[in-house]
Swiss-Prot record:
Pfam family, one: Abhydrolase_2
Gene: Lypla2
GO molecular function, one term: lysophospholipase activity
Stored InterPro entries: AB_hydrolase_fold, LYPA1-2/EST-like, PLipase/COase/thioEstase
Subcellular compartments: Cytoplasm
Name the record gives this protein: Acyl-protein thioesterase 2
Amino acid sequence: MCGNTMSVPLLTDAATVSGAERETAAVIFLHGLGDTGHSWADALSTIRLPHVKYICPHAPRIPVTLNMKMVMPSWFDLMGLSPDAPEDEAGIKKAAENIKALIEHEMKNGIPANRIVLGGFSQGGALSLYTALTCPHPLAGIVALSCWLPLHRNFPQAANGSAKDLAILQCHGELDPMVPVRFGALTAEKLRTVVTPARVQFKTYPGVMHSSCPQEMAAVKEFLEKLLPPV
């Protein structure tokens, strides 16, 4: 990877999947609570596109209120997983700034914002939604898996003006016991007040719990192929 990664802490040890050809687009994908970027780098390598670079950073280890203050990889503190749970506003905003720094690093290395997709699973998906909607750079889109929109009461006012053109693929398991699918549906409803409604796809998967599935990964691949064609 060219460019100085020292000024972007999340890049120094991020798991990456390089493109087989010249990289003209990037997918930045954020893992869920307690995980690392490696598992999603492995999953994304199964649907890789030859001209796309996949970057899967690791969250810092912090005490998590929801898990009895145990220290684990977490993008921000979590107090609960319901639409009315208190939220770590300062932590969410700080995490979003760190992801924006990563986006800007890729832009400096020659990948334009409209060739960058931000995505994530669970807490990582939540952070990807918040970051992309408040980002000053017009990204191509968002892949939001099994997640929610943090600080949802701040939207649509908190969104950047260019956010209305974002394409969003939101996917959710219908049997998710951690982040219920109803929460996902409420999130999709909210997102349609922030971006052009037709740009939001909300797909649900019968029998799937708080995880991904082959059909979902196929939908992600199709979404990325349309948004990030070869140039």
